[in-house]
């Protein structure tokens, strides 16, 4: 089917979420994640990027929106379901805050959300494993260090 498309400004995942996304991609599901190229908080953006590499190696496609800061929180699954709301993919949204979202099913709006997502990818940069090799070693260490504090973000 359509796969799973995720749009989130903050990608601060726990082990279970990384495993679920990776396993889906390994099974051949088209999993795509879109985050901003320019973050609004440098330390959160660093943790977001630190999560890319394990996902990319397992087949998840990561994109960064380059024209500016994207703050959308949307999920589209198999072109049949969509979620639009305030839920970030971070610890605070998933475990601490009370977030709000609309679940869309059996409505044309699901395809509208999907089409908007696909249009946004056209002005986004696909991130590859090769991109990780261009990051200086000291930034990689900083990303790893920041992941320790991920549950607080």
Give the role of each language-model region.
Residues 3-5, 10-153:
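PLD/PLD-like phosphodiesterase catalytic module centered on the HKD motif
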């Amino acid at each position: 089917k359509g796969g799973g498309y995720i749009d989130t400004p903050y990608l601060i995942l726990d082990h279970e979420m990384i495993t679920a996304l990776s396993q889906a991609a390994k099974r051949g599901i088209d999993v795509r994640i879109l985050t901003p190229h320019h973050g609004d908080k440098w330390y959160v953006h660093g943790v977001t990027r630190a999560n890319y590499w394990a996902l990319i190696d397992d087949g998840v496609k990561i994109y960064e929106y380059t024209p500016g800061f994207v703050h959308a929180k949307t999920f589209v699954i198999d072109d049949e379901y969509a979620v639009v709301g305030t839920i970030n993919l971070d610890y605070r949204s998933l475990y601490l805050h009370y977030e709000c979202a609309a679940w869309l099913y059996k409505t044309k709006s699901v395809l509208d959300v999907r089409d908007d997502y696909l249009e946004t990818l056209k002005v986004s940069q696909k991130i590859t494993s090769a991109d990780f090799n261009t990051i200086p070693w000291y930034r990689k260490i900083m990303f790893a260090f920041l992941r320790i504090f991920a549950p607080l973000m």
